[in-house]
A protein has these predicted regions:
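Short flexible loop/turn segments that cap and initiate beta-strands
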Residues: 228-237, 267-272, 637-650, 658-675, ...
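Accessory beta-strand-rich segments of carbohydrate-active enzymes
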Residues: 31-33, 93-197, 222-223, 242-246, ...
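C-terminal motif of bacterial Sec signal peptides marking the signal peptidase cleavage site
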Residues: 22-23
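Extended acidic/polar, glycine-enriched regions
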Residues: 154-156, 216-300, 697-699, 703-705, ...
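Beta-strand-rich structural segments
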Residues: 215-219, 277, 628-630, 710-711, ...
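Short S/T/G/P-enriched beta-strand
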Residues: 299, 607-625, 631-636, 719-749, ...
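Extended substrate-binding grooves/exosites of carbohydrate-active enzymes
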Residues: 33, 59-68, 74, 84, ...
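Extended carbohydrate-recognition surfaces in non-catalytic/accessory domains of CAZymes
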Residues: 27-115, 171, 177-180, 192, ...
Length: 817
């Protein structure tokens, strides 16, 4: 404790890294694993540092305070149409994540065992010492890595572990978090054992009658790779479904046949276990349980993306890794809550933008039926910020890809890999060579999945060879270039690797409701009418139309599922206090914005959608645009019982007529379009598409009372209705346990609503909500410009609501003023 870090650095890029996220042990197993949860932490660099007790996972920066000066960046953002540097405030969250940190723990180990430390992620530039000797250095904060506790260090069963971390200025263009923010494991095995990442499972042939399951098992003796023959051991793997053995494989490599397999899909996330045992003279030396799914995946120009022989399209979102008010510290209940909200919306896929995910996320996607695109990098060797991964790329890309692919190649939910996001190499001479080298390594490690790349420079990559070199081309935005890309790229398939980037603030509505890029307001909010976007982005309807009308599109990944810390576009240039994103379909407090129901109306096929906006608290004489997001074919709007007309969704043919200026009876008119802020970067927002996917009444006179929408089915019969009432003054708090049905292990998400005496939400309420008692963890309200601390038990309501994250069984009271 208080140990000074050695000046001499021993560089050990260990490739054999993590315990599979799907592996497990029991008390009778020769393999034992435990989480190392209790550590001491300091940022004090003096000879006698002051330590604090912390529980891992731990994000040292999330407690704040927020400050404009935290990672203030002077950069050029080309996507914004900039040619000169400008000050970017809040770009990485406005939290104090930069600097150095030191973690220490003392543990006991079994000195007769081979002991391995596994770090699921350490932010960043991790230097790990065991009993004063450096064991491993790993710079990339998102990847999993390991180190051995070498036998010569074990003079007793007591072991001191020290982890030194350093986050550098301009290391990230979003909030990276800080510290040991993912779990740390200790794995004890016999000297002869299956190394972590040592089991590979594939399902090369799959149909409803039978499936081939191929497996290969690595073996290790201490630090050395070895073989079953050399060690005089046998290896046996049983394939189990719900605890029952359905097939067996003998040896280090082999194939088993599973009859009548239960296939994995988002609708049926069936999972198998492979129980591998290493046996010597009748003694089980090691046992590893690897979870996997049986499914087939293919991508062809003829059939598009097929899962288990059925063509489908990704209905996906991109997500950053932070968990809002919890910061980057991983928590399974929080991840489960996010995925449950997305699945209820109809989402079936997640892209891990732009880094390796936490193992818990992949595990949950396997269990809950969420497909995944796993992406390691935001940059290659040409950076976007001064100290980003480009500094490490040349030395570390092989090790980082190797760890990532070996960690997640057995997971049923992983459908494809991405080699990078909007890398500058798209337009540089070295781009084709690098993307080819990366893809070759991916295929060497996993020949079963394709590799995509999120490309935003469409006007170049379509013709310069880069797009042709990407195995499965992904376009970020650039909806107006899809048809050109399909015509000229040889793959004849286009994936929407990143789409929309519509910006909005929950519960905030700007009038008039017009399509506008880079709209800025004095209150630092974006309109909840879902009509605003950045210069380089667009609206959901542009991507809906491409996916609906062209069979050569493979689906989309919307930017983003959840708001995240950092990147507060359009308030990103000297616009403090904005410090978190506006892109999310769901806000930073895990409260859905109106856009949630727009996507649900298109994606959720198991239940109808009917959603009305905005709120109905305006001033007498106001004219208010009213929108309805619905899966029903038509709906009628009423104010205090008076009809304002029945509208239906426009047909594809009618959108062409709308674009030509025609007014069509019974179809929503097109919204007006404001001038582009940066015309040369603006994409055509195609306002004629909106009446196809939403119903819009633009000139509804406000009268206090009720706003009602009535939906009609295909036969013209009333099918559903929704009512919004004018709210009175705040009267009391309404508490909703938002994640109760998810059966959380620890965390309760409590939605706190400020309501009037009749229970109607007060949509403009900004009261300060306080909790007094035990069990508080964090709070948030979804306001990207709010500087209330996440870790204090009080939070202002935003648009009448906020979220308190509590421990199960919390005791106390909520009050407001």
């Amino acid at each position: 404790m208080g140990m000074t870090k050695k000046a001499l650095r021993i560089f050990i890029p260990v490739l054999v890294a993590v315990l599979l996220c799907t592996a497990c042990t029991n008390v009778n197993s020769p393999r034992q694993e435990r989480l190392l949860r209790q550590w001491q932490f300091t940022q004090d660099t003096t000879e006698n540092p002051v330590w604090q007790e912390v529980t891992i996972p731990h994000d040292w920066a999330i407690s704040g305070p927020f400050d404009r000066a935290n990672d203030l960046q002077e950069v050029i953002v080309v996507q914004n149409g900039e040619s000169e540097p400008s000050w970017k405030t809040g770009r990485s969250g406005g939290l104090p994540w930069m600097g150095k940190g030191h973690y220490h723990t003392r543990i006991t180990v079994d000195t007769t065992k081979w002991n391995t430390l596994v770090f699921d992620g350490a932010m960043s530039h991790a230097d790990v010492y065991v009993n004063g000797e450096e064991m491993v250095y790993w710079p990339y904060g998102y990847n999993t890595f390991d180190c051995y506790i070498l036998p010569h260090l074990l003079q007793s069963d007591t072991v001191d572990i020290d982890v030194f971390l350093e986050n550098k200025p301009q290391q990230s263009r979003w909030y990276p978090g800080a510290g040991l923010y993912r779990n740390v494991h200790l794995i004890a095995t016999n000297w002869i054992h299956v190394p972590v990442f040592g089991v590979c499972v594939r399902t090369p042939e799959v149909n409803s009658d039978r499936a081939q399951v191929w497996m290969a098992v690595e073996l290790q003796n201490g630090v050395d790779a070895t073989s079953a023959e050399k060690e005089n051991v046998t290896i046996q793997t049983d394939i189990l479904y719900h605890g029952k053995t359905v097939a067996t494989i003998d040896g280090q490599e082999g194939v088993a046949i599973v009859n009548k397999p239960h296939l994995w899909s988002p609708e049926t996330p069936n999972l198998y276990y492979a129980r591998t045992r290493v046996i010597q003279n009748g003694e089980v030396l090691d046992e590893v349980n690897t979870r996997f799914g049986i499914r087939s995946v293919s991508y062809t120009p003829e059939n598009g993306f097929q899962l288990n022989g059925q063509t489908r399209k990704f209905k996906g979102v991109c997500n950053h890794h932070d968990l809002g008010p919890l910061g980057a510290a991983v928590h399974k209940d929080a991840l489960r809550h996010q995925l449950a909200m997305l699945k209820e919306m109809g989402c079936d896929a997640v892209r891990t933008s732009h880094n390796m995910p936490a193992p818990e996320l992949v595990e949950l996607c396997d269990e809950m039926g969420i497909m995944m695109m796993i992406e390691p990098f935001d940059v290659w060797n040409h950076g976007k910020t001064e100290n980003d991964y480009s500094v490490e790329f040349e030395d570390w890309w092989k090790a980082d890809i190797t760890n990532m692919v070996k960690q997640y190649r057995n997971n049923a939910s992983v459908m494809l890999w991405s080699s990078g996001n909007e890398v500058w190499n798209q337009v540089l001479d070295d781009g084709i060579g690098i993307v080819t080298a990366l893809q070759d390594l991916f295929h060497q490690l996993d020949p079963t999945r394709p590799v995509t790349n999120g490309m935003d420079q469409a006007r170049y990559i379509i013709h310069n060879g880069f797009g042709a070199a990407v195995e499965l081309p992904g376009l970020n935005y650039r909806t107006g270039r899809y048809e050109e890309a399909f015509e000229f790229l040889p793959q004849k398939m286009i994936l929407g690797s990143e789409t929309a980037s519509t910006v909005s603030s929950r519960g905030v509505y700007k009038r008039p409701a017009v399509l506008k890029d880079f709209a800025l307001y004095d209150d630092h909010q974006s309109s909840g009418y879902d009509l605003e976007y950045c210069q380089w982005s667009g609206l959901p309807e542009q991507d809906f139309q491409l996916q609906d009308d062209y069979n050569w599109t493979l689906g989309q990944f919307v930017w983003t599922g959840f708001d995240y810390l950092g990147e507060p576009s359009p308030y990103d240039t000297d616009a403090w206090p904005s410090h978190s994103s506006y892109f999310g379909i769901i806000d930073l407090a895990s409260l859905p914005k109106d856009r949630y129901w727009l996507y649900r109306s298109q994606w959720q096929k198991n239940a109808p959608t009917l959603h009305l906006l905005p709120h109905w608290n305006w001033s007498e004489g106001d004219t208010v645009p009213v929108f309805c997001y619905t899966s029903y074919p038509s709906a009628e709007l009423f104010v205090n019982g008076k009809s304002y007309g029945r509208l239906r969704h426009a047909t594809p043919e009618e959108t062409v007529r709308l674009a030509q200026g025609e007014v069509i009876k019974g179809v929503s008119p097109m919204p007006e379009v404001a001038e582009f802020t940066v015309p040369e970067w603006g994409s055509n927002p195609r306002p004629e598409l909106l009446p196809r996917y939403r119903l819009m009444w633009f000139d509804v006179p406000f009268e206090a009372g009720t706003l009602e929408v009535v939906a009609y089915d295909e036969k013209g019969k009333k099918a559903a209705s929704e009512i919004i009432r004018t709210a009175g003054q705040p009267h009391h708090l309404d508490l909703v346990w938002a994640n109760k049905d998810e059966k959380p292990e620890e965390l309760c998400y409590i939605t706190v609503r400020v309501v009037d005496k009749e229970g109607n939400l007060c949509p403009n309420a900004a009261n300060l909500i306080r909790f007094e008692g035990e069990g508080f963890i964090a709070a948030a309200n979804g306001d990207a410009a709010c500087l209330d601390s996440f870790v204090e038990p009080e939070m202002h309501a935003f648009a009448g609501q906020c979220t308190f994250i509590m421990r199960k069984g919390y005791k106390g009271t909520f009050t407001f003023e």
